[in-house]
C-alpha cells in the first residue's frame, strides 16, 4: 500500500496515510521524462487502487460507461462512486474502502431494510443504508464514525449519526468526487488497448 501511495500520490480510499513530500521529489528526479503511456497508466492505476478494483472489474465498468449516454469518463466515475462500499466510505461508516467492503461481506449492512453482501451493489437515489440491529454491527460503525476525520459530506449523501443511517439523495455530481483524477486519460488508456 505504501509503495502505491508513494508512486501515485494520496489515495484516500486505500489508506488514511499520506505520502511524504520529500520522497515525491526524489521519485521525480529518478524517473526522468514520463511518456504519455505512463501518464495514462498511472491515472488508471490510481483509479483502480482507490476503488480497490481488479483489472477485469474496471474494464467492465469502462465498457458499461462507454455504452451509456454522456461523457464516458463522467459516467465511469459516477458508476464507481455509487458502489455500496464507496458510499459507506464517503458516509464515514468505514475508514477505508477495503474496510467498507469487509463490513458488506460480513453482512453488517442493510439497504432499504434488506441485507446486502455484495460490495459492488449499485446504489440508487432514495436508497437508505443502515446497520443490522446487532450490537456488534453498531459498534463497528460507531468506532469508524468516531475515528474518521469529519470531512464535508458530498451533497448526494445524508447521514443520521444517531441512528447510523445514510441516505442517497441523488446521483453524484462530478465536483464532489473524492479523488483528484483525470478520467479522460483512463478512458483513453482503454480505448488504445482494444
Swiss-Prot record:
Recorded GO CC terms: chloroplast; small ribosomal subunit
InterPro entries for this protein: Ribosomal_uS4, Ribosomal_uS4_bac-type, Ribosomal_uS4_CS, Ribosomal_uS4_N, S4_RNA-bd, S4_RNA-bd_sf
Lineage top rank: taxon: Eukaryota
HAMAP family associated with the record: Ribosomal_uS4_B
Keywords: Chloroplast, Plastid, Ribonucleoprotein, Ribosomal protein, RNA-binding, rRNA-binding
Name used for this protein in its record: Small ribosomal subunit protein uS4c
Residue ranges constituting the S4 RNA-binding domain according to the UniProt record: 82-143
Alphabetized GO MF terms: rRNA binding; structural constituent of ribosome
Family per similarity comment: Belongs to the universal ribosomal protein uS4 family.
SUPFAM superfamilies: Alpha-L RNA-binding motif
Main location: plastid
Role, per record: One of the primary rRNA binding proteins, it binds directly to 16S rRNA where it nucleates assembly of the body of the 30S subunit. With S5 and S12 plays an important role in translational accuracy.
Subunit structure: Part of the 30S ribosomal subunit. Contacts protein S5. The interaction surface between S4 and S5 is involved in control of translational fidelity.
Localisation per UniProt entry: Plastid, Chloroplast
PROSITE patterns referenced in this protein's UniProt entry, alphabetically: RIBOSOMAL_S4 (PS00632), S4 (PS50889)
Organism lineage: Eukaryota, Viridiplantae, Streptophyta, Embryophyta, Tracheophyta
Species for this entry: Sisyrinchium sp
GO BP: ribosomal small subunit biogenesis; translation
Amino acid at each position: 500500500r505504501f509503495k502505491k501511495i508513494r508512486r501515485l500520490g494520496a489515495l484516500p480510499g486505500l489508506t488514511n496515510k499520506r505520502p511524504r513530500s520529500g520522497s515525491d521529489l526524489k521519485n521525480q528526479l529518478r524517473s526522468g521524462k514520463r511518456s504519455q503511456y505512463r501518464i495514462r497508466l498511472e491515472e488508471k492505476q490510481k483509479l483502480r487502487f482507490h476503488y480497490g478494483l481488479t483489472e477485469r472489474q474496471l474494464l467492465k465498468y469502462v465498457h458499461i460507461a462507454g455504452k451509456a449516454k454522456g461523457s464516458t469518463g463522467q459516467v465511469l466515475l459516477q458508476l464507481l462512486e455509487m458502489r455500496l462500499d464507496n458510499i459507506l466510505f464517503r458516509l464515514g461508516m468505514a475508514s477505508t474502502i477495503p474496510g467498507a467492503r469487509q463490513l458488506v461481506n460480513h453482512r453488517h449492512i442493510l439497504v432499504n431494510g434488506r441485507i446486502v453482501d455484495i460490495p459492488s451493489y449499485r446504489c440508487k437515489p432514495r436508497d437508505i443504508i443502515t446497520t443490522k440491529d446487532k450490537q456488534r454491527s453498531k459498534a463497528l460503525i460507531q468506532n469508524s464514525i468516531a475515528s474518521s476525520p469529519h470531512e464535508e459530506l458530498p451533497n448526494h449523501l445524508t447521514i443520521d449519526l444517531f441512528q447510523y443511517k445514510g441516505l442517497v439523495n441523488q446521483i453524484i455530481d462530478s465536483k464532489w468526487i473524492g479523488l483528484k483524477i483525470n478520467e479522460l486519460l483512463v478512458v483513453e488508456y482503454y480505448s488504445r488497448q482494444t
